[in-house]
Curated annotation (Swiss-Prot):
Modified how: 4'-phosphopantetheine is transferred from CoA to a specific serine of apo-ACP by AcpS. This modification is essential for activity because fatty acids are bound in thioester linkage to the sulfhydryl of the prosthetic group.
GO cellular component: cytosol; membrane
One Pfam entry name: PP-binding
SUPFAM superfamilies named among the record's database cross-references: ACP-like (SSF47336)
Coiled-coil regions listed in the entry: none
Keyword Plastid in record: no
Keyword field: Cytoplasm, Fatty acid biosynthesis, Fatty acid metabolism, Lipid biosynthesis, Lipid metabolism, Phosphopantetheine, Phosphoprotein
Role description: Carrier of the growing fatty acid chain in fatty acid biosynthesis.
MF GO annotations: acyl binding; acyl carrier activity
Domain Carrier residue range list: 4-79
Subcellular location(s) per record: Cytoplasm
Name of protein: Acyl carrier protein
Pathways involved: Lipid metabolism; fatty acid biosynthesis
Length: 80
């Protein structure tokens, strides 16, 4: 899976989970500051990403994922 494919899939999931227009979701979008996510939204988003990409995101790692780009980078590293 290429970085672009991961980015598109992450953006789609973020858009759906946070009920925002897909055009608003960019690589540098911060989940809380730019997209209006609260802490519960963030937990649900992490769970959705884990399911969609069949990976596990430990709590420590999840705390470091603040933007769409952070999520893409983490998934890329996990999927190798």
């Amino acid at each position: 899976m290429s970085q672009e494919e991961i980015l598109q899939k992450v953006c789609s999931i973020v858009s759906e989970q946070l009920s925002v227009e897909s055009a608003e979701v960019k690589s540098d979008s911060n989940f809380q500051n730019d997209l209006g996510a609260d802490s519960l939204d963030t937990v649900e988003l992490v769970m959705a990403l884990e399911e969609a990409f069949d990976i596990e995101i430990p709590d420590e790692a999840a705390e470091g994922i603040a933007t769409v780009g952070d999520a893409v980078k983490f998934i890329e590293e996990k999927k190798g």
